[in-house]
Amino acid sequence: MLDSFMTQLEIVGNRSKCVNMLLWSIFGFGVLKATTLILRIMACFVDLFVLPPVNYSKYGSKNGNYCVITGASDGIGKEFAFQMAKRGFNLILISRTLSKLETLQKEISTKYNVKVEVLAIDVAKDSEDNYSAIKELCGKFPITALINNVGQSHSIPVPFLETDEDEMRRIITINNTATLMITQIIAPMIIKTTKESSKKTRGLILTMGSFGGLIPTPLLATYSGSKAFLQSWSSSLAGELKEHNVDVELIISYLVTSSMSKIRKTSMMIPNPKTFVASTLRNIGRRCGAQERYATITPYWSHALYQLAIVEAVGVYSHLVNYINYVFHKSIRIRALKKAARDAKKQ
């Protein structure tokens, strides 16, 4: 009888130990998760509001070196041109419209006393002539920086099964094929310049990403997929070029006033290109809102906090986020179709 009682006590004790171990494991995991969250929030705030602006002398500014910028004639690309020139870089500007490039060339070279080369090509045409022209022009100059800004989205949100084939091909060609081909041409030139530099000059490759690539976006499926591809490609390239002293970063942005976004009015969540580019160049090398991602930066403060909230609260691949994104872009599509119908009646 006593032996049976003692056996039962031993069983209960063992079960109690197992329960205690389980509870302590859950508690430990909770503490680890909370600590990680707190550290990420702190790191984000330090990146955004505490650390001083990045010094671009390490990338060879004010030393005769060039920065190549694609999609440079309008919006964010145009602002990158102004602000990189202000930091002392000579420029090679690549875009589609020669008249815009020549106007920009004259304005920047006069204002900042830097050399500006321009090349007018349409990267939507995936031709060998385009890439040969880029290689021929850029091969003449010492290059330490490349900004892959050129990009294309849908004209309006559209279901994937209704997406025009030409629009789909154009998005993939501009956002992906052209970006990869141009980077493959320019990156060896950057490595060559940094190796030949008498100073410890680093190289820099920036690529424009998007919240559309961060979060799967119904009704912008092709664009969303093209930007998600850039995330994985850019982070992979960062690992490859690290040994060559080239910093590679993907820049994540939410909405910015531009011709592509079709938004003209700024707000707390929607900066203009000048403000967005200033926050980007101030924080290169820091993750800001992209704390969970390697070689990635979400530089504008409201975008950074928005990303941090989504990632830590529900996750970018959650059904809730996908549904909210769908409803949001469906409403944009409905308004766009109504506007198109009204415009058609006026004609």
Curated annotation (Swiss-Prot):
Active-site residue numbers: 223 (proton donor), 227 (lowers pka of active site tyr)
Entries under SUPFAM superfamilies matching the protein: NAD(P)-binding Rossmann-fold domains
Highest rank taxon of the organism: Eukaryota
Entries under CDD domains matching the protein: 17beta-HSD1_like_SDR_c
Pathway membership: Lipid metabolism; fatty acid biosynthesis
EC number(s) reported in the record: 1.1.1.330
UniProt cross-references to Pfam families, sorted A to Z: adh_short (PF00106)
Keywords: Endoplasmic reticulum, Fatty acid biosynthesis, Fatty acid metabolism, Lipid biosynthesis, Lipid metabolism, Membrane, NADP, Oxidoreductase, Transmembrane, Transmembrane helix
Bilayer topology annotation: Single-pass membrane protein
Matching Gene3D superfamilies: NAD(P)-binding Rossmann-like Domain
GO cellular component terms, A-Z: endoplasmic reticulum membrane
InterPro entries xrefs: 3_ketoreductase_fungal (IPR027533), NAD(P)-bd_dom_sf (IPR036291), Sc_DH/Rdtase_CS (IPR020904), SDR_fam (IPR002347)
Chain positions recorded as NADP(+) binding sites: 68, 122, 149, 223, 227, 256, 258
Compartments in which it is found: Endoplasmic reticulum membrane
HAMAP family hit by this protein: 3_ketoreductase
Family membership: Belongs to the short-chain dehydrogenases/reductases (SDR) family.
Name of the protein in question: Very-long-chain 3-oxoacyl-CoA reductase
Lineage: Eukaryota, Fungi, Dikarya, Ascomycota, Saccharomycotina
